[in-house]
C-alpha cells in the first residue's frame, strides 16, 4: 500500500500518521522543495519508506529507519533508483533483543537483524522469499514498535494522575 503527501504537507505529522495507520508502507512526497532531513525523519517517525520527488534540489528514497537508499543532487543524476525491502519489522529493542540469538540461530542468513543502539530500535528483515517477518514476530512473541508503544501508552494512561 502507498500513500501520498504533497509539498507543504511535510509540516503536519497527523497526515503522515493517518496514512501509516491505514497501512501505507511507502509514502510518496512530490514537492517544490527538497525537504532535507525532514524526508528522512518522516520515514523513521512513521516506520515506513519515503520517496521524494522535487523539481529542484535533492530527491531521495529513504528506508524505514530514515537511511537514504538513493538520492539525486544538483550535480548528480536526475533519477533516484534503489531497492526497498518491505518484508521487515521495526521494533523497540528491549526486551525483544533477548530473543534475537534464537531467531538468528533458526533463520541464519535468511534474515538480518539490525540494531540502532542509541535509539534502541531494531529492524528484522527477511532476506529470503520463503521467510515472512510476520511469522517470526508471531513465533517469537515480538511486537512491532507501534504495538509496543501502544501497550506502554495504555499503562501510562491508566496510572497518570491527570
Residue ranges of each PLM-predicted region?
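CN hydrolase (nitrilase-like) catalytic-core segments centered on the catalytic cysteine
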Residues: 10-111
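A short C-terminal boundary segment appended to hydrolase-like catalytic domains
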Residues: 89-162
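Active-site beta-loop-alpha junctions enriched in small/polar residues
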Residues: 7
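Beta-strand-turn-beta hairpins that frame and shape the catalytic cleft
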Residues: 1-3
Amino acid at each position: 500500500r502507498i500513500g501520498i503527501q504533497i509539498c507543504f504537507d511535510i509540516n503536519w505529522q497527523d497526515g503522515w500518521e493517518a496514512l501509516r495507520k491505514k497501512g501505507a508502507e511507502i509514502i510518496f512526497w512530490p514537492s517544490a522543495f527538497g525537504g532535507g532531513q525532514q524526508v528522512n525523519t518522516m520515514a523513521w517517525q512513521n516506520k515506513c519508506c519515503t520517496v521524494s520527488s522535487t523539481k529542484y534540489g535533492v530527491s531521495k528514497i529513504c528506508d524505514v529507519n530514515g537511511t537514504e537508499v538513493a538520492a539525486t543532487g544538483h550535480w548528480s543524476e536526475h533519477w533516484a533508483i534503489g531497492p526497498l525491502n518491505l518484508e521487515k519489522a521495526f521494533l523497540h529493542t528491549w526486551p525483544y533483543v533477548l530473543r534475537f540469538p534464537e531467531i538468528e540461530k533458526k533463520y541464519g542468513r535468511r534474515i538480518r537483524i539490525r540494531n540502532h543502539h542509541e535509539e534502541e530500535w531494531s529492524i528484522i528483515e527477511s532476506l529470503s522469499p520463503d521467510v515472512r517477518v510476520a511469522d517470526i514476530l508471531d513465533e517469537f512473541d515480538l511486537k512491532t514498535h507501534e504495538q509496543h508503544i501502544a501497550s506502554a501508552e495504555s499503562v501510562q494512561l491508566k496510572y497518570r494522575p491527570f
